[in-house]
């Protein structure tokens, strides 16, 4: 059987893996091992879900392609990292099964014997799941469709693969889903669980992120739930774990009027506690020095949440070595100033605005959502070069992203 075509195009710090434009393609997961990038995906072939493996060297060439196994279309397949080792976890016929990645061998145990026997009168309709590992305990976060066709989020816990899972948290319906969900993935670090997933409405994809704070005693608290997608047709956002537990996020961008699908991969990756990453590996700003001339420097951290009122004058400043940049709201206008020089002004009217600032070294990106119009621009602090992108899309009308409080 012919394997999905794949080629790599490099552009500065970003590699684009180009695949066939097939709506059935799903990214299962990936990881870096040395200079070899491993990518796993499925596509529907002859009414079967087929798992493929790809390896690329230095993000420049494909060095291996393989078909691993065929599954039923309804089966859910995930790649998980448990204590540095990678496994495939398959949900089929209401049971979980586990395979080692290399070599591709089925392990002789079931993760969960039968979810329907855990106090539920009927079989659970699992839409998607992800598994993470904290302090010798396995946690399964499941998206389950209830009788009202709403998606509920439940967390199961188990000390061992073989032991019975028990529900430790049921968040109920979070009104997360429009038409469908997929690409649920998770990442745990320093007491925070990052969960990323896609939803789809009227053929528009929107990636969303949930952040949980974890405390001993299996206590989970939602810190943030917000949209992540910048483009209406963006899909398959997922976590990739790189060297030294670094983390970045990648997505398939299914371009309209194109025969190709693009998988965007940041090649320079970094991670710091409490900072949420966005392509290409930019970080939420943590060098804010003043808000409306009030000194927050001693209180503000990367976990802080800033709430602004677009109808009132607003000024945000941060330092960068020998210069100062200010972000201003005044008379329903948004402006960026550097060293007392205005470099950008946008009319915000009176719409509700969500503002986020992402930083990667000297590159700053700022996004504003006003009604159905989303404006994103980035520039280099050293030369003031910046790009502006305006996306008219109802799907991101309620776009919100930001850092979060750590009480």
Regions found by a protein language model. Give the residues of each.
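Hydrophobic residues embedded in beta-strands of well-ordered beta-sheets
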Residues: 37, 49-51, 86, 96, ...
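A compositional/structural signature marking long, glycine- and acidic/polar-rich segments
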Residues: 143, 147-242
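Surface loop/turn signatures of beta-propeller and other carbohydrate-active proteins
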Residues: 1-31, 59-81, 104-132, 163-186, ...
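Beta-rich accessory regions
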Residues: 1-22, 28-32, 201-203, 208, ...
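General structural concept
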Residues: 40, 52-54, 66-67, 73
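Beta-propeller blade signature
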Residues: 53-56, 98-102, 152-160, 206-216, ...
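Hydrophobic core segments of beta-strands in well-ordered, beta-rich domains
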Residues: 26-44, 78-93, 119-121, 126-148, ...
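Recognizes the extracellular SEMA beta-propeller fold with strongest preference
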Residues: 91-105
């Amino acid at each position: 059987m012919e394997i999905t075509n794949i080629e790599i195009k490099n552009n500065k710090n970003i590699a684009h893996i180009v695949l066939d434009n097939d709506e059935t393609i799903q990214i299962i997961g990936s990881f870096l091992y040395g200079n070899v990038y491993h990518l796993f995906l499925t596509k529907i072939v002859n009414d079967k879900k087929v798992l493929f493996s790809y390896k690329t060297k230095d993000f420049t060439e494909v060095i291996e392609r393989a078909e691993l196994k065929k599954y039923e279309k309804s089966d859910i397949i995930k790649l998980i990292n448990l204590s540095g080792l990678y496994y495939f976890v398959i949900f089929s016929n209401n049971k979980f099964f586990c395979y080692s990645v290399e070599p591709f061998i089925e392990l002789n145990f079931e993760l969960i014997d039968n979810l329907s026997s855990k106090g539920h009168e009927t079989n659970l309709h699992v839409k998607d799941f992800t598994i993470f590992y904290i302090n010798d305990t396995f946690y399964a976060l499941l998206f389950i469709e209830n009788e009202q066709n709403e998606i509920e989020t439940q967390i199961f816990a188990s000390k061992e693969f073989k032991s019975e899972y028990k529900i430790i948290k049921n968040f109920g319906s979070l009104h997360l889903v429009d038409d469908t969900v997929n690409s649920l993935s998770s990442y745990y670090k320093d007491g925070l669980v990052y969960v990323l997933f896609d939803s789809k409405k009227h053929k528009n994809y929107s990636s969303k992120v949930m952040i949980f704070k974890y405390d001993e005693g299996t206590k989970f608290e939602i810190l943030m739930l917000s949209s992540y997608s910048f483009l209406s047709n963006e899909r398959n956002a997922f976590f990739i774990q790189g060297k030294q537990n670094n983390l970045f996020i990648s997505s398939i961008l299914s371009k309209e009027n194109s025969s190709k699908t693009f998988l965007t991969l940041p090649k320079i990756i970094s991670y710091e506690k409490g900072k949420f990453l966005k392509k290409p590996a930019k970080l939420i700003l943590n060098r804010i020095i003043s808000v409306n001339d009030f000194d927050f420097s001693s209180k503000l951290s990367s976990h802080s949440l800033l709430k602004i009122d677009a109808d009132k004058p607003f000024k945000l400043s941060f330092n960068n070595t020998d210069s100062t940049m200010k972000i201003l709201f005044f008379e329903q206008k948004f402006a960026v100033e550097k060293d007392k020089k205005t470099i950008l002004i946008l009319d915000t009217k009176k719409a509700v605005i969500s503002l986020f600032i992402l930083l990667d070294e000297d590159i700053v990106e700022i996004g504003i959502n006003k009604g159905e119009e989303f404006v994103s621009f980035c520039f280099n602090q050293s030369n003031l070069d910046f790009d502006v992108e305006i996306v008219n899309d109802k799907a991101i009308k309620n776009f919100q992203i930001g850092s979060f409080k750590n009480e």
